[in-house]
Curated annotation (Swiss-Prot):
CC annotations in GO: nucleus
This protein's name: Transcription factor MYB76
Leader sequence segment: none
Listed Low complexity bias regions: 155-171
Length: 338
DNA sequence: AACAGTCTCAACCGCCTCGAG
DNA sequence: TCTCGAGGCGGTTGAGACTGT
């Protein structure tokens, strides 16, 4: 073997990087490009291991890294993706242009996790905490605006307002199924233990749909009740996701400024229908007539790393099969979920 | 002003996967 | 086919900043 270890050596420096070291690393990568991290320290004149150089570059020095406060849209994306994917920081970071996995991870651990707990939501399962909410079906409120309000109105906290959004029966049935343990959420991953009496491929797809059902439940219950700002300014939000906002905004006045929306009734099927109608004008749409289960579903629609793009597809399925979560689990030996 | 407690986040640690040899 | 190192990733640490008393 000609390979040499790239992180072993005498007198390697650890700890915080100095400005001088940063300059050397930036200068070297500017001239020679990324890669070959094993050799970079020696060639750049740094007493660091290659791995340390790579981390310093990818997490801090890289020119296209966005730093500073996370926007509301970014926060919502993080929460939604965390609900469905768990601590997959690199996957989440891919949906947030110019954000690093390390930054997303830190932001989650220091800000979002605490706020979810404050609002009575388990940051691991994304379900209401049992101790704070005796009714597991009733969505808890996550107030996206609290952070900005805290400075100005520290004595006011809308999180004390009771959750006021009764979800439709369809969504409630899905959420209650999830809450009752028929789907199991482990370490933030939604893993549907309900076994469907179908072929392996369709079973996997159903479980994908189930996973998305839980995330849409979370995002809707939190987004509708929280304060949303116009999605038009958001960057990187897929169209279908933006449309869900637009629909809500079209139907609820002052959504962008109200904290407690107090929506008396929200018709989830109607929302999905609207979503589909909106999408009919676009390309690459799976219409209600298309059987998501039996077709060779294009892989682009079930890309696990692009779940936001799947909303149209699985919401269409939910509309057609509102009771899919109740389907028989007989005869299934399916073990490869998701 | 001094101290203690808390928070933040850059950096490190260690495990895993992939691919070169 | 096997070995092993590079690179990727998530978890954890700890120094410095911040806040409260």
């Amino acid at each position: 073997m000609s390979k040499r270890p790239y992180c072993i050596g005498e007198g390697l420096k650890k700890g915080a990087w100095t400005t001088e070291e940063d300059k050397k690393l930036i200068s070297y990568i500017h001239d020679h490009g990324e890669g070959g991290w094993r050799d970079i320290p020696e060639k750049a004149g740094l007493k660091r291991c290659g791995k340390s150089c790579r981390l310093r570059w990818t997490n801090y020095l890289k020119p296209d890294i966005k730093r500073g406060e996370f926007s509301y849209e970014e926060e919502q994306i993080i929460i939604m993706l965390h609900a469905s994917r768990g601590n997959k920081w690199s996957v989440i970071a891919r949906h947030l242009p110019k954000r690093t996995d390390n930054e997303v991870k830190n932001y989650w651990n220091t800000h979002l996790k605490k706020r979810l707990i404050d609002d009575g939501i388990d940051p691991v399962t994304h379900k209401p905490l049992a101790s704070s909410n005796p009714n597991p079906v009733e969505p808890m409120k996550f107030d996206f605006q609290k952070k900005s309000n805290q400075d100005e109105h520290s004595s006011q906290s809308s999180s004390t307002t009771p959750a006021s959004l009764p979800l439709s029966s369809n969504l409630n049935s899905v959420k209650s199924k999830i809450s009752s343990g028929e789907t199991q959420i482990e370490s933030g991953h939604v893993s549907c233990k309900k076994r469907f009496g179908r072929s392996s491929s369709t079973s996997r797809l159903l479980n994908k749909v189930a996973a998305r059902a839980s995330s849409i439940g979370n995002i809707l219950s939190t987004s509708i009740e929280g304060t949303l700002r116009s999605p038009a300014s958001s960057s990187g939000l897929p169209d279908s996701f933006s449309q869900s906002y637009e629909y809500m905004i079209d139907n609820k006045e002052d959504l962008g400024t109200s904290i407690d929306l107090n929506i008396p009734e929200y018709d989830f099927p109607q929302f999905l229908e609207q979503l589909i109608n909106d999408d009919d004008e676009n390309e690459n749409i799976v219409g209600p007539e298309q059987d998501l289960l039996m077709s060779d579903f294009p892989s682009t629609f079930v890309d696990e790393d692009d779940i936001l793009g799947d909303i149209t597809s699985w919401s269409t399925y939910l509309l057609d099969h509102p009771n899919f979560m109740y389907e028989s689990d007989q005869d299934s030996d399916e073990k490869n979920f998701l």
